Amino acid sequence: MIRLRILEILEEQQHTKYWLYKQMELSYQNFNRMVTNETSSIRFDNLEKLSKILNCPIGDLFETIDDEEK
């Protein structure tokens, strides 16, 4: 399973979820689903925006986990 590491990256960079929410300009519902890995898809433009805002390569936004670790 692939999941987004947004919360971990925010913690590493000492930013809040609210800070990122304001930067992303998404509805809170869509933003929260993305951040909490409750979505099955994400738009490429949102990935690009995340990468720029968090100043990290797109690949760093993801991690692969075993299904048992859910």
Spans of model-derived segments:
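Short alpha-helical DNA-recognition segment
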Residues: 15-33
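A short, Lys/Arg-rich alpha-helix, primarily the initiator
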Residues: 1-16
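Short, charged recognition helix plus adjacent turn
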Residues: 8, 33, 62-70
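Short, basic-rich loop-to-helix N-cap that marks the start of a DNA-contacting helix
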Residues: 39-49
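The alpha-helix within a helix-turn-helix
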Residues: 10, 21, 51
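The DNA-recognition helices of helix-turn-helix-type DNA-binding domains
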Residues: 27, 38, 65-68
